[in-house]
Each structure stands twice: as structure tokens, then as C-alpha cells.
Curated annotation (Swiss-Prot):
Biotechnology: Disrupting the production of quinolizidine type antinutritional alkaloids (QAs) by selecting inactive tetrahydroanabasine acetyltransferase variants is a potential kick-start for the domestication of novel legume crops.
Family: Belongs to the plant acyltransferase family.
Protein's UniProt name: Tetrahydroanabasine acetyltransferase
PANTHER family xrefs: ACYL TRANSFERASE 4, HXXXD-TYPE ACYL-TRANSFERASE FAMILY PROTEIN
Keyword Acyltransferase: yes
Source organism, top-level taxon: Eukaryota
Amino acid sequence: MAYQMASLKLEMNEVVHVKPSKPTPSIVLPLSTLDHRPYPDSIWPIVHVYRSASNGKLDPAFVLKQALSKALVYYYPLAGKLVKQPDGKVAINCNNDGVPFLEAIANCNLSSLNYLDDHDILIAKQLVFDLHLQDENEYPHPVSFKLTKFQCGGFTIGMSTSHIVCDGWGACQFFRAIVELASGKSEPFVKPVWERERLIGSITTQPMPNPMDEATAAVSPFLPATDVMYELFKVDKESIRRLKMSLMKEISGNETMEQGFTSFESLAAYVWRSRARALNLNNEGKTLLVFSVQVRQHMSPPLSDGYYGTAITEGQVVLTMKELNEKPLSDIVKLVKESKNIAFTGDFIKNTIDTLESNPENFNVEEGPGATLALSDWKHLGFMPNVDFGWKEPINMVPAPCNMFEYEGLCIFLSPSKYDPSMEGGVRVFISLPSVAMPKFREEMEALKVTTP
């Protein structure tokens, strides 16, 4: 069931700043080299969707604010402000400024929005806190919240997190701590640690090369575009199984695979090729697939469980459009697997950090319009914690298409919502494309349901 933007109207309360419930240290904390990988103003907003409680007596805004206040005792840097240091780097001033919290009341039921399970997710933009900065030199708050109550008793929690402070794993850890405290726990199960000094690089005279340059990057006739669409595509478990089976048939008899292909590797290659086809990239131009690789447990020694800063490197695969379009898909999947395995190694992690410390511009890929696809896998992050704080677990979670999620070259793999049982074991693919390119991409994704690639 589709919905229209006009079906949602919100009545806003005044913004409040939620502070830690106990005194916290007043200190300026430096960030790591990897923390500086995103732009300082990069905010990634997500919306958690909850059904109404069985008793209906609890006020979700009150419960969440109380739990947030307790969580900030442990995560007190998130109640501070980002500041620029004399050396140009960013730090957190732990000044107890508090977390901006906005409460809103909607004029409809969540069921009328299909619990945000439809492909049209632009409505999610209204459910996150768009805090406009008064000064262009000012940085956003590390985190902010918007809780929207619906007429049915259900609600959404829009959490906007600064990517320079937390990566996806860290943001999930923080959100889980809030939910645990809201459920009555006396403390979070995982205690946060700062330890950003573990990921500070050294100046190197041999930085990693830029994977692609502007002169050789592929271009699309559809970009730049002013009319961009955002969609969520559902890929069920059977479609993924069929895709992986077809890949194994391609390599059968030609070579021995010690390991099969994962769902991520298979779908990453397929989506990369499908997007490139939809954008009609020029044949001789190069296209880059870059995807986040979590390295917490691959450090030596591994990072502490409570580490919530950025701890990701990037797997990278570069092909010409002709190669991407004509190679067997299994060859492309193998390149994804190889790149992922390299990104896990200690040498690659160290070289990434040292290169970022020495030449951060090497990570700002100059590209022709549409040449790069940046892929992030959220399926195993735990954004929908199985913790009941009065409303059971969230039924859905979606990214809101604003700030860094407005980037045309971004794609996110998400777990299915619990609203659609038929999607158990499947994947949702969030992607943005020029409107003129979306029909072709949709056709490619539909092909997964009926035929082998």
C-alpha cells in the first residue's frame, strides 16, 4: 500500500537538551585518524519504528529521555560538541551541552504508513531531527533524537548520529545501551571505551594510491541530476539462494572454491553491475565499487568490545564498464571476496590509517558522475535490538534520505522489517538514482525473482 507525503502532518514540541543524569568529566577528547575519514558534518539519520504497547500507559518520550540521560553518563562525549583544534583536526569538547531531543505528534496511525515498509521512504525525512546550524563553521551535535507519537499508540525514534564520532557498529551499541536502560537494567551490558589513540596513524612516504582518477572514470549521461529517487528493494531468501546457485554453476568444473560466496559478496556484485547498467556508464570508463569492512576483531590486539568510534576500512574493486558488463558475474564476485579479505589484513589496516593521516585527499575519490558505488552492509549491526522496554522490539528500521544518505552513489543493505514475514532471511537494498535511471535498475532487481542472472 503506497502512501503520500501529504498523509503525514506533525505537531512539534519545543526542543530540549537531555543531559547526563550524573556529573561527567569536563575534558576535550581527540578523535582517531579513522574518525576523520568522513566529513565532519556527515550525519546519518535512521528511523526505528515501534508498534503500540499492550498496556498503553507508558509515555515513550518520557521513557526514552530518562534512559538517554542515564546512557549519557557512560557515553558522556555524545553530550558534548565537536570543535576544531588548532591543527585543523576535530575533537569533542565534553561540556555537558546535552543531546537535542524533539518530540512530535503525528495525525495518523503507523499502519496507514505501512510501518514505513513501502518503497517510498521519503516520509522518513520528516521523522528525524533536521537541526539547522546557525554558523557555517559550526559542527553538528554528535547525536540528536526525534520521537514521533502516532494516533495508534505506536511511535518512531529518529536518531541522527555524526559519522565522525560513531560508525554504524558504535551507533548500534549506543542505541542498545539506551534500550537496555529503558527496560530497567541498571547499566549497559557493554561498557563503552574511548581508546581512539589505538587508531591514530603515522606520516608515511608511501601512501596507498588513489584507486581511480577523474580522467579515466566512467560517466553517465543521466548525471549530474536534479531529480533523484530513493527506493528500498526487497530481495527475498529464495532469490538470494538462486543467485548464489547460479554463481556456483558458472565456476563448476573450472576451478575449486575452498569457500563459497556469501550473500553480501553475491548481491554486492549484482547490485554494482545493475546500477552501472541503469546509469548507462560509458564502456571504456572505470567504475569503482567501495564497501565498508569492519575491522574491530582484526586489529592486533582486537579493539575492546565497547569501542564505538569508526573502525572500518574499505574494500575496493575497479573495472571498466565493459569488463563489469561482460565478465561472468562469478568473476566479479571473486574480486569482491578477494578485496574484502585484503581489507581485513593488518598491513592493509595500518596502510589505510597511515595514508589517511598523511594524505587524506587520497580517500576523496575524484570521479566522473556515477563512477563510484559506496556500499554499506547493515544487516548484522543489530539496529533492531531484541530488547523489550515496554513496546517489544522495533518492527522496522529505515535510513532517512537526508545529509549523507542523499549521496547519489550510496547503497545500503538492510535487514528485512518484521512487518513482512515473507522476507525473513532476505535483504532490503536502499539506493538512490536519477529518476530516469531507476526503471532500468528496478528491472534488474526484478530479474532476481524470476530468472538466473
